[in-house]
Curated annotation (Swiss-Prot):
Coiled coil residues, start to end: 83-173
Gene name of this polypeptide: Mnd1
Annotated localization: Nucleus
Organism: Mus musculus (Mouse)
Biological process terms in GO annotation: homologous chromosome pairing at meiosis; reciprocal meiotic recombination
Protein name as annotated: Meiotic nuclear division protein 1 homolog
Family the UniProt entry places it in: Belongs to the MND1 family.
């Protein structure tokens, strides 16, 4: 013979509410601990826990009078309490669904952007490596450049190009100064001062 299954927590809560609705009476805990096992099959040891859960959910009212707690519940209030509870649960469900949707979007966005992020990280790493290599090469070049004939020749050629360019600009400046003196009658010293041209400004030999 199979063992009889005990009541679930929700079944105990439902049967406890039936006691209040059917009797429309006010009870103390000790009264319910006697009545609930007999009328509804709720074990006396679980009455207090079930009762407290109903009080916490606003289904049952509790008032302390003197040294005793008194419990009661009316169908209309229980209905409103259930309605509020249902609304709260629906609200939580809606919020949960929205959070899930937002999270899903974030995941998809992260997936889309992951390749770019990885590529940027890889490029940044390569760039850093190239910079390090460049610094090392520059240091090596500095050590040997003074005794490298090719480097010396390149430096001479670069100096020659720079000298020619500087003298071309010198030509231009002298031409502008000459034009300004003829056109506006400016003194050469004032032109030099206004344009920051040094007194010893001349061609490079």
């Amino acid at each position: 013979m199979s063992k009889k299954r005990g009541l679930s927590g929700e079944e105990k809560r439902t049967r406890m509410m039936e006691i209040f609705f059917e009797t429309k009476d006010v009870f103390q805990l000790k009264d319910l601990e006697k009545l609930a096992p007999k009328e509804k099959g709720i074990t006396a040891m679980s009455v207090k826990e079930v009762l407290q859960s109903l009080v916490d959910d606003g289904m049952v009212d509790c008032e302390r009078i003197g040294t005793s707690n008194y419990y009661w519940a009316f169908p209309s209030k229980a209905l409103h309490a259930r309605k509020r509870k249902l609304e709260a649960l629906n609200s939580q469900l809606s919020e949960g669904s929205q959070k899930h949707a937002d999270l899903q979007k974030s995941i998809e966005k992260a997936r889309v952007g992951r390749q770019e992020t990885e590529e940027r990280a890889m490029l940044a790493k390569e760039l850093s490596s190239f910079r390090d290599q460049r610094q090392q090469l520059k240091a090596e070049v500095e050590k040997y450049r003074e005794c490298d004939p090719q480097v010396v020749e390149e430096i001479r050629e670069a100096n020659k190009v720079a000298k020619e360019a500087a003298n071309r600009w010198t030509d231009n400046i002298f031409a502008i100064k000459s034009w300004a003196k003829r056109k506006f009658g400016f003194e050469e010293s004032k032109i030099d001062k206004n344009f920051g041209i040094p007194e010893d400004f001349d061609y490079i030999d």
